């Protein structure tokens, strides 16, 4: 047609924290337009970020006097600290000290504590049992591995119950330890195993737990509210419905509340009875998930839908037997975590976000895809691990709008010396010496 078309590619090389996608385009025909001015971070964080960058860009404060990182015509200096201690357990004590005087760890909107994985955060946020069930349940792991052995033709499932096929399959974990032995040696797991061991294998094999289901409660930007994602299972959707009723009543949205229940209000006595019922329900969060569902159904005149009943009696049977005994408050904590009401988040999840105060914990646990020691010239020599760790650390640091504290459990003199070069000697804190 003779018309010229300009195609723009927007990306930040240092924020390519996932192995999928394209992190960098190398083509001589592309005109590179670098974003030099930084509108988010204080000077102290910009300085750290520039030391981490390996894309040949050196950022500087914005020239816009109205930029978020400007105050009275000058760049906000901000504060950065590198804190080290012998043990990760020291962190709890450190959070109560002067270094965090102006931080409010109950304010998830302005303060974030960044850990590498949801597993770390589930413990901190108060839903570790739920997270373990959806991500590392031993009985479900054994079921999946037995199915794989059957698929490979290693064993035959014909006319066998769960106990028989579990013993024949001899599934191992770690250093050759039988998963079945681990299950029998754990009273919690063994109780569930005893419940299901006589069931026919063709019934057991249909049980499924989707690890993505628990954390699939997301904000819908178009609708302006949080809702269940497509991977949300029927049990969690039921809990979402109950929790929604709690919130509708709490925030006095009575018309919407009544539309979703069969509770009828004809006089003051009905209104008083509803108030009493809701007070009882709201004080029952320490009860189990099953107890809360039963109480809510009875008090609010609601019923389980056919999809819920079908799910808990078929592929969700084992999941239901497990989850129904977990305290309802763990479910509530998982919702608060996903709504970002709590100060905990994964380092991957905050890309694009910004907070006044950011605490980054450099502990990669047992995830061998990362090694934060490489930031300071130690640890893994794997190039992928080195690049992955650096970019993730860069993303974490550049979330801070005022204060950045990096905590690392280490006593390695080489790491501490390298940290001094990166952060400056005046910004290094020995957490072991803080009393």
Show the residue positions of the predicted features.
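The feature marks helicase ATPase cores and/or their adjacent C-terminal helical subdomains
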Residues: 1-435
């Amino acid at each position: 047609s003779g018309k010229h078309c300009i195609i723009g590619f927007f990306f930040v090389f240092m924020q390519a924290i996932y192995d999928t996608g394209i992190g960098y385009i190398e083509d001589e025909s592309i005109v590179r337009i670098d974003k030099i001015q930084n509108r988010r971070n204080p000077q102290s964080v910009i300085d750290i970020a520039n030391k981490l960058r390996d894309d040949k860009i050196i950022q500087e404060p914005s020239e816009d006097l109205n930029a978020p990182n400007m105050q009275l015509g000058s760049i906000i200096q901000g504060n950065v600290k590198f804190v080290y201690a012998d043990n990760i357990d020291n962190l709890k004590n450190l959070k109560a000290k002067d270094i965090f005087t102006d931080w409010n760890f109950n304010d998830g909107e302005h303060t974030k504590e960044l850990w590498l994985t949801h597993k770390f955060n589930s413990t901190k946020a108060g839903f570790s049992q739920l997270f373990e069930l959806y991500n590392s349940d031993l009985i479900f792991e054994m079921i999946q591995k037995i199915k794989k052995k059957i698929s490979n033709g290693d064993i035959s499932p014909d006319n066998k119950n769960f106990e028989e096929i579990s013993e024949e399959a001899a599934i191992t974990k770690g250093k050759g330890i039988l998963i079945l032995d681990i299950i029998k040696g754990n009273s919690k797991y063994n109780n569930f195993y005893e419940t299901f061991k006589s069931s026919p294998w063709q019934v057991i094999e249909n049980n499924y737990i989707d690890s993505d289901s628990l954390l699939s409660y997301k904000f819908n930007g178009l609708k302006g509210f949080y809702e269940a994602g497509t991977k949300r299972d029927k049990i969690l959707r039921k809990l979402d419905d109950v929790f929604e009723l709690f919130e509708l009543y709490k925030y006095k949205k009575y018309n919407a509340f009544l539309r979703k229940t069969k509770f009828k209000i004809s006089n003051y006595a009905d209104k008083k009875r509803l108030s009493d019922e809701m007070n009882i329900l709201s004080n029952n969060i320490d009860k189990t998930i099953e107890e809360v569902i039963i109480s809510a159904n009875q008090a609010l005149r609601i019923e389980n839908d056919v999809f819920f009943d079908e799910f808990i009696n078929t592929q969700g049977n084992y999941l239901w037997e497990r989850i129904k005994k977990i305290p309802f408050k763990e479910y509530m904590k998982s919702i608060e975590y996903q709504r970002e009401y709590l100060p905990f988040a994964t380092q991957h999840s905050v890309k694009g976000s910004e907070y006044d105060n950011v605490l980054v914990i450099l502990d990669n646990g047992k995830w061998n895809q990362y090694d934060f020691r490489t930031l300071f010239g130690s640890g893994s020599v794997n190039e992928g691990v080195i690049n992955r760790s650096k970019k993730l650390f860069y993303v974490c640091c550049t979330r801070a709008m005022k204060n950045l504290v990096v905590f690392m459990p280490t006593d390695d003199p080489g790491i501490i010396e390298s940290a001094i070069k990166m952060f400056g000697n005046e910004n290094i804190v020995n957490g072991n010496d803080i009393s």
